[in-house]
Amino acid sequence: MPNKLVNYATLDGIAVIELSSDAAGAPLTETNDRSPNTYTHEMMSDLDDAIIKARFDDDVSCIVLTGNGSSFFSAGASIQMLNSVTPGFKYNFCLHANETLSRLEQTSKLVVCAINGHAVGGGLEIAMAADIRIARKNSGKVGLPEINLGVLAGTGGTARLTRLIGKAKALEMMVTGELMSFEDAHAHNLINHIWEGDAADFRRDILDWCSQFTLPNKATKAVGNIKRSCQTGPEIPFEYHLALERELQASLFNSSDAKEGIAAYVEKRVANFTGQ
């Protein structure tokens, strides 16, 4: 096993970013299926680097974010780390984590979070910055229980959970510290899909499913523009969102892939997209 906090690999147009750490947020020194994958500033810096690496790789069309092992996607920030640093460090730690997750959220490539186990606290905050969340059945729960530590979910948790599931349920979930089953999370649109299978099957199925978003299967510029409209549009007035949508569409009409897609439809053949 690579002795890293964040493992990075690419396979057929997909970048796989894996969180991998012990309870203290240190790199794993041996195989551990129950690793909590807690994060420190060092792991968040490594995650930031991996996001930028995938963003600039023209051969990468889709990003898969997951955790090591079969028990946790991530248990969130290392409590041992938080207990040993100053309030000033904690503030900048949260600020940097916010910047990293915003970078993930704003990356034009589709980000799929493969929730292979519990995603709690900061672990759920990371998952919520992805575009699509898929969980492995019966492998864990999700929640933002920071209230039990006397704090709030300060890495985008209050902002993203409210936007994803609505104010009333998000507020209740955070002030009670409730941990939600994957089934309940799916019912509240926090999780897109729940798949059965062991950890190895789950990862294989995730990669197979994500292959549909790679070239030549999908027009990657169109995927990126759809994501940009969906991410940015809800934060601006509706008429501005419509204007943004028109401009994004206009740029696609001038792309080679739009010409290929329309021609393939007329000619009743499968389109061969190039990302141009």
What are these regions (language model features)?
Residues M1-T66, S102:
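Conserved CoA-thioester-binding segment of acyl-CoA-metabolizing enzymes
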Residues I17, D46-L47, L65, S78, ...:
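Terminal peptide-recognition signature
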Residues H41-F56, I79-N116, A159:
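An acidic, glycine-rich surface segment that forms the CoA-thioester-binding/catalytic face
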Residues M1-N3, A263-Q276:
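Terminal low-complexity tails and localization/encapsulation signals of metabolic enzymes
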Residues R103-K218:
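Crotonase-fold acyl-CoA enzyme core
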Residues D33, A135-G140, I191-A243, S256, ...:
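C-terminal long alpha-helix characteristic of the crotonase
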Residues M43-M44, I51, F73, Y265, ...:
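Conserved hydrophobic/aromatic "anchor" residues
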Residues S21-D33, T38-Y39, G67-T100, A119:
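Glycine- (often His-adjacent) and acidic-residue-rich active-site loop
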